[in-house]
């Protein structure tokens, strides 16, 4: 991980396409199989991909409640606190939406989506936080039917995931994962209902299925590997920064970590501490590969250059740990979420800060936003004009219609003026 100056980094900075195009035929075949054969195909794929025989795809409400009831008290309280903070934050956003009406003639009105599917990753780890960071938003929006899909496990779906489903009042939970679960939510099967929108992170198969099926169903985003970029100075706690970097790297060997500073010595000191801590880090195989191939130390010459580098990266997570972080809040524009100060580490945002941890990756923060209650609402523009207002603007409307040679448009106005 050699240190680069800002210009060197920008000259060589590029992101590979987040998806492997060779997966396209596989995804297409899986989706078609689910569309035609429904539950039978899902059970076959559970056996083929997840090595789990599932006689029943749906997990009963009794099982979901039992998972919550038998959960240890400390975990239960942690999940509950996370839920309450997420809910409060999203309710504040929804309240702002209700205050958007500016006139009685033109305004916006919001309606919840009718049904939403949430993908919760499985595999080697359990992710109750994903349930909280997605289903809570749908609940606050007022979505009528919230459906969770998650890969089957030989010992059953994680009790923590089921407990989070109970807390967020998820309607149905199905043990099916991968591209096949996205197809099931898109088309519907004998057991799994068709939904209007699918959200939640997943592997390349999940991401590609969402891309392939978009248009037939709404989606949140096409997620790439996770990433963090930090701007630090000599007041930063470098031991804490080491674990901010490791925390991101342990997600995926393709996870990207960037550290930017105007102080070259700070970067050298951090490099030494990372090298010292790395051999003993948990999840070494994943972290070490990420650090070796996707970790960057970037020396910026001044404040503006540091911000320019950050905006060019447009990371999923940005962290500012400097003596005076406030100026960065306006200058750093293109990030999924901005974490300010020593006591706002990115990891706190993964779990309990309040905003959703489902954020844009792979530079898409330059044109899109993190998941919020708004993603579970439709926004209708209402136009209800008085005769006086119509009379004031009708001539302009009919003239523009005439200029565009849309004479029936023009006549629609003229007939009301007569």
UniProtKB/Swiss-Prot annotation:
Binding locations of substrate: 226, 248, 251, 317, 350, 404, 409
Top-level division of the source organism's lineage: Bacteria
Annotated metabolic or biological route of this protein: Amino-acid biosynthesis; L-histidine biosynthesis; L-histidine from 5-phospho-alpha-D-ribose 1-diphosphate: step 9/9
GO biological process, any: L-histidine biosynthetic process
Cellular-component GO terms for this entry: cytosol
Active site: 316 (proton acceptor), 317 (proton acceptor)
Enzyme Commission designation: 1.1.1.23
Main enzyme class: oxidoreductase
Keywords for this protein: Amino-acid biosynthesis, Histidine biosynthesis, Metal-binding, NAD, Oxidoreductase, Zinc
Residue numbers binding NAD(+): 119, 180, 203
Reactions mediated catalytically: L-histidinol + 2 NAD(+) + H2O = L-histidine + 2 NADH + 3 H(+)
SUPFAM superfamilies assigned: ALDH-like
Matches recorded under PROSITE patterns: HISOL_DEHYDROGENASE
Cofactor remark: Binds 1 zinc ion per subunit.
Sites where the protein binds Zn(2+): 248, 251, 350, 409
Family recorded in the similarity comment: Belongs to the histidinol dehydrogenase family.
HAMAP family: HisD (MF_01024)
Protein name: Histidinol dehydrogenase
């Amino acid at each position: 991980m050699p240190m680069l100056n800002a210009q060197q980094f920008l000259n060589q900075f590029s992101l590979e396409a987040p998806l492997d195009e060779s997966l396209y035929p596989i995804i297409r075949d899986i989706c078609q199989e689910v569309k035609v054969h429904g539950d039978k195909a899902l059970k076959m794929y559970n056996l083929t991909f997840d090595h789990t025989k599932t006689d029943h795809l749906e997990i009963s409400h009794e099982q979901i409640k039992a998972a919550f009831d038998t959960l240890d008290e400390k975990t239960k309280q942690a999940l509950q606190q996370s839920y309450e903070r997420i809910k409060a934050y999203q309710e504040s956003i929804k309240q702002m939406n209700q205050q958007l009406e500016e006139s009685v003639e033109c305004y916006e009105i919001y309606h919840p989506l009718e049904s939403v599917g949430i993908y919760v990753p499985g595999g080697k780890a359990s992710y109750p936080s994903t349930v909280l960071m997605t289903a809570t938003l749908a609940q606050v929006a007022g979505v009528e039917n919230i459906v969770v899909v998650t890969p089957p496990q030989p010992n059953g779906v994680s009790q923590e995931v089921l407990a989070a489903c109970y807390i967020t009042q998820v309607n149905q939970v199905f043990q099916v994962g991968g591209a096949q679960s996205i197809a099931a939510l898109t088309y519907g099967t004998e057991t799994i209902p068709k939904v209007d929108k699918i959200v939640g992170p997943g592997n390349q198969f999940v991401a590609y299925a969402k891309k392939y099926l978009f248009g037939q169903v709404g989606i949140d985003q096409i997620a790439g590997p996770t990433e963090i970029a930090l701007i630090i100075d000599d007041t930063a706690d470098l031991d804490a920064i080491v674990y901010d970097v490791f925390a991101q790297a342990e997600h995926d060997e393709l996870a990207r970590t960037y550290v930017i500073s105007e102080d070259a010595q700070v970067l050298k000191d951090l490099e030494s501490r990372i090298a010292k801590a790395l051999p003993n880090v948990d999840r070494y195989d994943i972290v070490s590969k990420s650090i070796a191939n996707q970790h960057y130390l970037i020396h910026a010459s001044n404040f503006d250059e540091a911000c320019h580098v950050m905006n060019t990266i447009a990371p999923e997570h940005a962290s500012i740990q400097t003596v005076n972080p406030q100026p960065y809040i306006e200058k750093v524009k293109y990030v999924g979420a901005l974490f300010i100060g020593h006591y706002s580490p990115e990891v706190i945002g993964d779990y309990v800060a309040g905003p959703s941890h489902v954020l844009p990756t792979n530079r898409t923060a330059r044109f899109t936003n993190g998941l919020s209650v708004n993603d579970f609402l439709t926004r209708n523009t209402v136009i209800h004009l008085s005769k006086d207002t119509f009379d004031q603007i009708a001539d302009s409307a009919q003239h523009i219609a005439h200029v565009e040679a849309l004479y029936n448009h023009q006549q629609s106005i003229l007939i009301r003026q007569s």
